[in-house]
């Protein structure tokens, strides 16, 4: 499932599982207009094959999402094969992924970069999920 769009909020109130990839582009550029996703709502999502949060266009920093500061929307997520979070310039807390991180087995399942906070796999496994 891939989302690339221009809405402020992405809501999946009944979504419990995505067997493949859940790929959410959190910003979208149309000409000079930049739209940023402000809210993700997935209160019962428990399982995802691969979780990807990135931007539609990485060529300019001003086109990357700077609104999302945490991943609390994924609090219910317990099982994920790969977590890939990139280009979220306001993101300072991965605490919402705490349950899912517990099930990750090696650093190849943790791809994080170009965010406001970028914990390593070891830091994430040790519970260092928020920027100090």
Identify the residue ranges that each predicted region occupies.
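Concave beta-strand-loop units of leucine-rich repeat
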Residues: 1-132
